[in-house]
Amino acid sequence: MRRIFTAALLLVAATFAAAADRPEGRSFATRSVTYARHGMVGAAHPLAVQVGLDVLKAGGSAVDAAIAVNAALGFLEPTANGLGGDLFAMVWDPETEKLYGLNASGRAPKSLTIDKVPARENGTIPVYSVYSWTIPGCADGWFELHGKFGRLPMKDLLGPVAELARDGAPVPQVIAGGWARSIHRFKDKPGFAEVFMPGGRAPKEGEVFANPALAQTLERLAAGGRDVFYRGEIAEQIVAFSDEVGGFFSMQDFANHTSEWVEPISTTYRGLTVWELPPNPQGLAALQMLNILEGFDVAAMGRDSTDFWHLMVEAKKLAYADRARYYADMQFAEVPVEELLSKDYAAERAKLIDMKRAARSVDPGNPMVDHGDTTFLVAADKDGMLVSLIQSNYTGFGSGHVVPAVGI
C-alpha cells in the first residue's frame, strides 16, 4: 500500500507554468507535473518559495527550508499567517522511516477565566478581541523542528527573511485584495494601522510593503533562540502591549508554553494512506471527508460536473458538523477519533447526502452509537525528507491587534 501525508488536498508546482501548459477551452487551469532531483518547495508566494530553494541549495534540510519559507510567508502574506499564530507540521524522516507530528499551538492565558469573557448570543468567544488571544506557538514550533531535523544555523534561515522584511516586497493581487477587504474590521484595532496601513491605507497591488519591526524580531530570534521570544525581550514587549489594551497575557504564560510531538492519525482512500495531525488541529475533517467520498464513484462524475462539486460541498458539511461537535483539545476532552474515522460511520453519514438538493443544515452524527482559518507549505530535500506545514493566525489578520514594537 502506498503512503502519503497531507495537511490539505492540494496541487503543488515549483515553477510557473508555461502558457502551453494551460489547455484551451477548459474551465480550470492546469499545469504540468514538475519533477526535481534535489528538492522541491511549494508555497503561496514565489518569493517565499525562492527563500526555501536557496536554503536547499545551501545544504539545508527540508525542515530548514520549511522554517525559512514560513518566516517569509509571515511577512509576505500577513493576511493568513505570522509569528503571532500557531503552527502544525508533519515530517517524514527517511533515516528513521517514521512520520513525526508537531502541534505548536498555544494556550489561553491562565488569568482568562470563562466568567471574564463577555456573553454572546451564539455562545462564541469574540474573535477580534483580546479574549481570543492564545500564546503564539509559531516561534517555538520553528525551534522544535530545527532542534530535531535542522542542519543550517537559524541565522542562515531567518537572516535572509529579515533582510526581505526590512527592504520590502511588492504586494501581489490576491493578498492586496484580502488586505483591502480587512481594513474596515481592523483599522481601529490597537497597533494595526501603524504596521499594516502605511500611508493610512492598505497597500495596493504592486506597491512595496516593508515591516522593519518584524525584521528586527527575526534577527533577535536568530541570535537569541526561542527563549528571547518566550522568556526575554520579545515576550516582555508583547505582555506590555497586552496590559495596555486590556489583555490577559503574563510572562508566566509565555514561559510555560511548550509544543507537543504527537502521533499522526490516518485513514485509507482507494489504496492510499492519508495522514493528518490529531485534534486540536482540524485535519481529522479532511480524513472524514475522504471516508465519505470513498463510497461514491467520483471519477465517473468528472471534475467539472455539478455532481462532483455538490458531493464535495455536502461531504464537507457533514465533516464540519462533526468538527463543531466533537473536536477539542485532547488534553482536556475525549475526542472519539477512532469512531469518527470508522468506515461504517462514514457510510452512515454518506446516506444523508441527497444528490438532488443541498442540505440547508446538518446535524453532527453519533460516532459512539456502537461503542456505548491559514497558509500551507511543503518542502522536500535530496535525502527524501518531506515536510507538510500549516501556520495560521486563525482567521486573516487574527484578532487585528498588532504589537508595533515587534511587528506581529
Regions found by a protein language model. Give the residues of each.
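Internal maturation/activation junctions in enzymes
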Residues: 295-393, 403-406
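Bacterial N-terminal signal peptides that target proteins for export
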Residues: 1-8
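A short, polar/charged loop-to-alpha-helix boundary motif
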Residues: 112, 396-408
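Hydrophobic h-region of N-terminal signal peptides that target proteins for export
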Residues: 10-18
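Noncatalytic scaffold domains of N-terminal-nucleophile
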Residues: 20-50, 62-224, 229-231, 236-281, ...
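A short acidic/small-residue loop/turn micro-motif
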Residues: 107, 394-396
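Short glycine-rich loop/turn motifs
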Residues: 37-39, 86-88, 262-264, 286, ...
